[in-house]
């Protein structure tokens, strides 16, 4: 398969699917293990924050690692370390007993997993242009299918996570997660693709830190990238607590792990359909209109969810949010891929990712205590109303018009 025109692209897609499934399981499993101990949303937010705080630095390092060490190598190393971090949960339970897997241990392991994950994701994304060209696909088509497959992993992952927790327990579920990462390693290990191996050192700065700064400067002085990064930073900070703390808290209080999996699956199913449909939608909607629709819809949906309606309505709203947000990642990927030179591609992807995650820990710090003190309804509103405001502000951002002007350097 590696010698066929589509072989490299299919291997990248398979790796994205299995790694996404592994991460999807952890979204359910880590908060569930914490909330089983004492039911505290604060503790759950601490572990969720531990799983996001390292992303700010890790994505910067990941981008540099991809450019300096090579995309294929970094992808495999990242997935191996991610597999070890989640496998450590059942290993510690076997050696020291279940009580050893406490909130502090889970926070450390979640942090380690979060530190390793971005490198693999960045490496796979930066290989897409060459893989798409070899397969004869347009970049929009490749990005939409890639994000759809990644979302499919997040559909399978939470579903497996909820079922495994109900049948095997939260700790043993981590074995399945480790296995998913190993499948990704196997796929990339047989990949052969131009630009995926050793990098061209002649176009790189000697110092890695200087290379990271070079990536930061490129993003900051490219107006469309700077605007996208700021919008994503705010949206991530407002949305992440809902998925990582508020939904787990709501369904844990009701002892409904399977229903939590359904909600996360609804988000991912919507995202899958939205990402798959983007290649067609892009013929009729501008990138700017697509993005504005996504941000405004997310704010409206979060506001309705704040009133904790019946589960069927929550599922519908989550599916809608996933659908309108599905094309956003392909749009971001396209703009990064078509504005950044090849030797800077990894660092630009890393910088954009790190800025998106910068607000996540702050949102989690605030959401956990607020949920314990004021309740889920007030916390949802505290997140949804600023999201609505972001949608209104985005309408008047002139740089977003450049989304439809991006072209290959």
Curated annotation (Swiss-Prot):
Q: Which residues form the signal peptide?
A: none
Cross-referenced PANTHER family: ENTEROBACTIN EXPORTER ENTS, INTEGRAL MEMBRANE EFFLUX PROTEIN-RELATED
Q: Which GO terms describe its molecular function?
A: transmembrane transporter activity
Gene3D superfamilies xrefs: MFS general substrate transporter like domains
Return the NCBIfam families for the record. 2A0121
Q: In the UniProt record, does the keyword Transcription regulation occur? A: no
Q: Name one GO biological process term.
A: response to antibiotic
Alphabetical GO CC annotations of the entry are: plasma membrane
State the name under which the record lists this protein: Multidrug efflux pump Tap
> Which cell locations does it reside in?
Cell inner membrane
Alphabetical keyword list = Antibiotic resistance, Cell inner membrane, Cell membrane, Membrane, Transmembrane, Transmembrane helix, Transport
Q: How does it sit in the membrane?
A: Multi-pass membrane protein
Q: What does this protein do?
A: Efflux pump that contributes to intrinsic antibiotic resistance. The pump uses the electrochemical gradient as a source of energy. Confers low-level resistance to tetracycline and to several aminoglycosides, including streptomycin, gentamicin, 2'-N-ethylnetilmicin and 6'-N-ethylnetilmicin.
User: Per the UniProt record, which residue ranges are transmembrane?
Assistant: 10-30, 46-66, 80-98, 104-123, 144-168, 174-193, 218-240, 260-282, 289-308, 313-335, 348-370, 375-397
**Family under the similarity heading:** Belongs to the major facilitator superfamily. Drug:H(+) antiporter-3 (DHA3) (TC 2.A.1.21) family.
Q: Which domain of life is it from?
A: Bacteria
**Regulation of its activity:** Efflux activity is inhibited by carbonyl cyanide m-chlorophenylhydrazone (CCCP) and reserpine, but not by o-vanadate or chlorpromazine (CPZ).
The principal localisation class reads membrane
From which organism does this entry originate? Mycolicibacterium fortuitum (Mycobacterium fortuitum)
């Amino acid at each position: 398969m590696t010698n066929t025109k589509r072989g490299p692209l299919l291997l990248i897609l398979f790796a994205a699917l299995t790694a996404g499934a592994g991460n999807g399981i952890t979204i359910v499993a880590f908060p569930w293990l914490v909330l089983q101990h004492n039911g505290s949303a604060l503790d759950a937010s601490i572990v969720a924050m531990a799983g996001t705080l390292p992303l700010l630095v890790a994505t910067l390092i990941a981008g540099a690692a991809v450019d300096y060490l090579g995309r294929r190598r970094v992808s495999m190393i990242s997935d191996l370390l991610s597999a070890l971090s989640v496998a450590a949960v059942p290993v510690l339970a076997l050696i020291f007993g279940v009580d050893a897997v406490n909130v502090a241990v889970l926070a450390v392991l979640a942090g380690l997993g979060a530190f390793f994950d971005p490198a693999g994701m960045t490496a796979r994304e930066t290989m897409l242009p060459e893989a798409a060209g070899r397969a004869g696909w347009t970049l929009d088509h490749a990005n939409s299918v890639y994000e759809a497959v990644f979302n499919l992993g997040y559909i399978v992952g939470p579903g497996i996570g909820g079922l495994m927790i109900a049948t095997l327990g939260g700790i043993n579920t981590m074995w399945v997660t480790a296995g998913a990462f190993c499948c990704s390693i196997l796929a990339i290990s047989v990949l052969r693709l131009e630009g995926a191996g050793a990098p061209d050192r002649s176009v790189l700065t000697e110092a890695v830190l200087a290379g990271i700064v070079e990536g930061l400067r490129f993003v900051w002085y490219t107006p469309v990238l700077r605007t996208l990064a700021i919008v994503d930073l705010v949206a991530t900070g407002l949305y992440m607590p809902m998925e990582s703390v508020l939904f787990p808290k709501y369904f844990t209080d009701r002892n409904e792990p399977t229903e939590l999996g359904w909600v996360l699956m609804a988000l991912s199913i919507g995202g899958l359909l939205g990402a798959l449909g983007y290649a067609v939608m892009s013929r009729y909607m501008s990138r700017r209109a697509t993005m504005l629709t996504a941000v405004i819809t997310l704010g409206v949906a979060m506001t309705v969810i704040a009133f904790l309606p019946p589960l069927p309505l929550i599922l519908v709203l989550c599916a809608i949010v996933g659908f309108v947000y599905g094309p956003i990642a392909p749009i971001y990927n396209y703009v990064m891929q078509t504005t950044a030179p090849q030797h800077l591609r990894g660092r630009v992807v890393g910088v954009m990712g790190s800025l998106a995650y910068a607000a996540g820990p702050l949102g989690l710090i605030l959401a956990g205590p607020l949920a314990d003190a004021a309740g889920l309804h007030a916390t949802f509103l505290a997140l949804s109303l600023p999201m609505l405001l972001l949608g209104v502000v985005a309408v008047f951002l002139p740089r977003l018009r450049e989304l439809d002007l991006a072209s290959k350097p």
